[in-house]
Amino acid sequence: MKLNIALMLLAITSTFNVQANTSHLQQADTKFVISSYAKTQYPLVFAHGLLGFNRLGTENLGMDYWYQILPDLARNGSTAFATRMSPFNSSELRGEQYVAQLQEVLAITGAKKLNLIGHSHGAHAVRYATGVMPKKIASVLTVGGANQGTVVASDVMKLANTTGSGELINVLINAFGNVLMWAQGLDGQAFPHNALAAGHSTSIEGTAEFNQRFNMGLSLKKCGEGKYQDQGMALYSITGNQPATNALDISDMAMKALNRLSAYKEGANDGIVSVCSAKFGKTIRDDFPWNHLDEINLMFGIKGTFAPDPVNVYRQHANRLKLQGL
């Protein structure tokens, strides 16, 4: 299946002109601002998850990871950036990549602080940033964050270890990571890939190690609320709890398959991350009728018929921060 996806991406990207990027930041741009509803004091900086990207393809023919979310924020007054990290690597390495781009945003905008938003494995990146540069962070929102790891990653790592297939898995997935880089108009070696490091970092066991060093916003109780404020930072989380949401969404099949494993061992989940694992700081809502990809409006915004629009939810969060002076 991964090979088919890789070949499809190769076919798509063969029509694009690959251009060198001097910055790995993608700033939200708009030709007109319709309101100041989402005009936060500090810029919003997004961190993608495992297998993530900024944009596959070009502006005119491509797909953003945060589909339609950043442009909407810009139209409503926000200064927002999407960062780029290695699709597959450890939480610490990705965290360093993220922090370097946060420093770039601070330099570009002259802002004193930043509002961070991380999805999936990106939750580790934003939490890493709170640990290494807390005075520069105003708020954190984790979205479907693997804050306690995922049983899916744990089981994949156990399978790799027991069958001795770890190196083969690493080679195949790293090759797919290179395809993702190419699809963004980048050299495949622009960011280092280490699928086994990524698997360990997102496993329950690996995340427990990470949490010993970066425990801000986490609860001592299973599935509990963390501190809402810590060191002057406002801490929030949201997540979905429905693996399959729309028959027209081709990703739902994968979410349903993964749910069979996650639900058996971890209960309610979004197809990859359990509701309990997604807990961080103040839970805004943990029952959005979304799956793991709906949370970022991926697959061109296809979602459940009556599900809230993720674009609106991110805009509302920006307004929440604005009202707090953040």
Language-model segments: which ranges?
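Serine-hydrolase catalytic core
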Residues: 184-246
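Boundary at the C-terminal end of the N-terminal hydrophobic targeting segment
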Residues: 18-22
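Active-site catalytic motif of lipid deacylating hydrolases and related acyltransferases
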Residues: 36-114
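N-terminal signal peptide c-region/cleavage motif recognized by signal peptidases
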Residues: 13-17
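Sec-dependent signal peptide recognition
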Residues: 2-8
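N-terminal low-complexity, Pro/Thr/Ser-rich intrinsically disordered segments
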Residues: 23-42
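C-terminal catalytic-base region of ester-bond hydrolases, centering on the histidine
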Residues: 221-326
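Serine-dependent carboxylesterase/thioesterase catalytic core
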Residues: 48, 96-206, 270
